[in-house]
């Protein structure tokens, strides 16, 4: 199912994650009619992957529906603008440091980069990642989100959470959407599909 959560700046934090969590609760309550209640996977790309990661944290902290996995494609998860990759690709399309600041400001307003930011809005701020569902994280090597995504995967491993990380050589942000027939895009889709099948669709 696709969740049409409300978008910033008209609906800033916490609307996107709260909408996504409400949808997750509804899906879990109707899982018998929709599919398998024991195999609920959350997926997102870019800002949507940040919402997915935040929703996974919220589900854990509210003892909400159990997720079997989180598939995060180029997730936007850190508002603090401190990594090497945020400066390394400044001025380079399709999404650079200025775009990133604009996006975070739309979501957080004047709170961007301050201590007054929730882990559900910016999951990289979470200190405790234990108890989260297994994760698949990928990004391009030539994108702003690279370092925060690698750091998040490392933090998941440190917390004892199963995670699979792919950094696609030469990939820019959204490379698989812009060049779907390129070899790198086909490889990325195959890796994602393989993870979903192996962990969530195979018979138990």
Indicate residue ranges for each PLM-predicted region.
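Alpha/beta-hydrolase superfamily serine-hydrolase fold, recognizing
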Residues: 1-204
């Amino acid at each position: 199912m696709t969740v049409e959560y409300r978008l910033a700046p008209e609906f800033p934090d916490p609307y996107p994650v709260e909408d996504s969590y409400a949808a997750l609760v509804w899906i879990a309550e109707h899982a018998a009619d929709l599919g398998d209640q024991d195999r609920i996977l959350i997926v997102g790309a870019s800002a949507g992957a940040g919402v997915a990661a935040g929703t996974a944290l919220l589900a854990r902290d509210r003892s909400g529906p159990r997720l079997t996995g989180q598939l995060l494609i180029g997730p936007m998860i850190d508002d603090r603008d401190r990594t090497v990759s945020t400066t390394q690709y400044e001025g380079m399309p399709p999404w650079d440091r200025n775009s990133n600041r604009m996006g975070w400001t739309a979501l957080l307003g004047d709170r961007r980069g301050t201590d007054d930011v929730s882990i559900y809005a910016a999951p990289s701020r979470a200190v405790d990642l234990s108890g989260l569902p297994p994760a698949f994280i990928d990004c391009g090597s030539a994108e702003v989100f690279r370092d925060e995504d690698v750091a998040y995967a490392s933090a998941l491993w440190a917390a004892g959470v199963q995670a699979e990380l792919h950094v696609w050589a030469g990939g820019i942000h959204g490379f698989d959407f812009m060049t779907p027939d390129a070899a790198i895009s086909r490889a990325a889709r195959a890796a994602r599909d393989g993870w979903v099948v192996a962990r969530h669709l195979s018979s138990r």
